[in-house]
Amino acid sequence: MDFSNFLCIEQELKLIALLVILFLYDTFCSKEWKKYFQNIAIVGFAIVIISEFPPYFTMYGEAFGGIHISSQLTFFMKSILNVATFLVFLQANKWLSSEKMLLRQGEFYVIMLISLLGMYFMISAENFVMLYIGMETASLPLACLVAFDKYQEKSAEAAVKYILTSALSSGVMLFGLSFLYGSLGSFYYSDIALNIVSSPLVKLGFVFFFGGLGFKLSLVPFHLWTADVYEGAPTSVTAYLSVVSKGAATFALIFVLYKVFGRIELIWNNILCWLLLATIVLGNLFAIRQQNIKRFFAFSSISQAGYILLGIIAGTAQGMTSTIFYTLVYLFSNLAAFGVIASVEYQTNGDTRIVSFNGLYRSNPGLAFVMMLAVFSLGGIPPFAGFFSKFFIFMAAAEQKQYILVFIALLNTVMSLYYYLLIVKAMFIEKRGEVVLEKIGIDNYNRISMVICTIGIFVIGFLSAIYEYIETISFGVLQK
């Protein structure tokens, strides 16, 4: 076997090496040494991330018979997922340090890294079989993570819902892939892109395939699992689902639509337009009436997926660039919010109702400030990064004369400000009554994560070099 194949999977090999080390440490170390596991996992993953820059030994190109591809773009996408996962690790520290979780830390980190490895394969796939294997490798560990807090009934219930809907989406995707293979005779992206025709079988195959991937993105009508799973899962797992899992699905969808189905753009463009409208509108409408903060962010996440579709619908290099940039900004904004949620939830013994945030500013002004920045960025209020990411998305769609979609998206952006400001109102204006929320002790790891997210929210929008870099490395992906 050619050794250059392994140079093309440098990121995967480093992650596998860390996985093996953590697994062996957790398996063979004594209980006295288990207390150091978190530090080893966090520092080890940080070393893996840092060691990838600059990528001296990474070789770009196809590997293992063309089923895997590495490029500057895939490297950057995986790096985005790495940063998001690292921030989730930091935020999970206090929860995993509790007495009931102390001996289960190893399981949490190993399972989450296995899921991340599957997402690597989804991004680098050049073959639909590879994409499916990556998706399943990512999904099965996620079901374990959703049920990780076995002492909570909602966690087990959420896991069952996630497993059932995930299995259904996998079956639907395989059904679609069977149509594509039957009509085109190949699973390779390049072969399908070369021979694809607008036949009824291809159209049907695409619809079923997209339905399976739409589950990962929580697009309407594939979103029914989202609110219950987000509410029932441990908060750190919810953060991972809303950012890392959604990001991997977004990146995989970009490659499939632009590289494989670029020649039948008119077909998938029409489908995505209707899904976009339903996703943005229903996500916003249901978010308004939520009383639980995690369900609130579940529907917020659904509506945010609609903006991602708007960038993809543009079908241009600018549209793809703005979609990737939007995902990067969404990472910092959403994880900043979940860092605050995790802290408040721990202090209030698992209370995730929005009213539990009443008067947060009076006792914990720092946390209230971070949450305010997060929801302002998610709502697209200038001068935060979320404003610039939405602006680029709207510009990309407007350049392709998608004026109606842009107008509806703008209206829904204004609508979203109402429910985002409800959180700000609860923290800064509402009073808690007789029960006063004590000052929350934030551990150093979570504090670091929120500082990183805050810097990202403030700075990324003004760094045009990041957008330009994404535009540069995205060159050549479009196949029409």
Curated annotation (Swiss-Prot):
One of its GO terms (biological process) is ATP synthesis coupled electron transport. Keywords: Cell inner membrane, Cell membrane, Membrane, NAD, Quinone, Translocase, Transmembrane, Transmembrane helix, Transport. The chain crosses the membrane at residues 5-25, 40-60, 69-89, 110-130, 162-182, 204-224, 237-257, 266-286, 296-316, 324-344, 368-388, 404-424, 450-470. It is found in: Cell inner membrane. The keyword Ion transport does not apply. GO terms for cellular component: plasma membrane. It is a multi-pass membrane protein. It catalyses: a quinone + NADH + 5 H(+)(in) = a quinol + NAD(+) + 4 H(+)(out). It comes from the Bacteria. Its EC number is 7.1.1.-. GO terms for molecular function: NADH dehydrogenase (ubiquinone) activity; NADH:ubiquinone reductase (non-electrogenic) activity; quinone binding. Belongs to the complex I subunit 2 family. NDH-1 shuttles electrons from NADH, via FMN and iron-sulfur (Fe-S) centers, to quinones in the respiratory chain. The immediate electron acceptor for the enzyme in this species is believed to be a menaquinone. Couples the redox reaction to proton translocation (for every two electrons transferred, four hydrogen ions are translocated across the cytoplasmic membrane), and thus conserves the redox energy in a proton gradient. NDH-1 is composed of 14 different subunits. Subunits NuoA, H, J, K, L, M, N constitute the membrane sector of the complex. This is NADH-quinone oxidoreductase subunit N. It comes from Azobacteroides pseudotrichonymphae genomovar. CFP2.
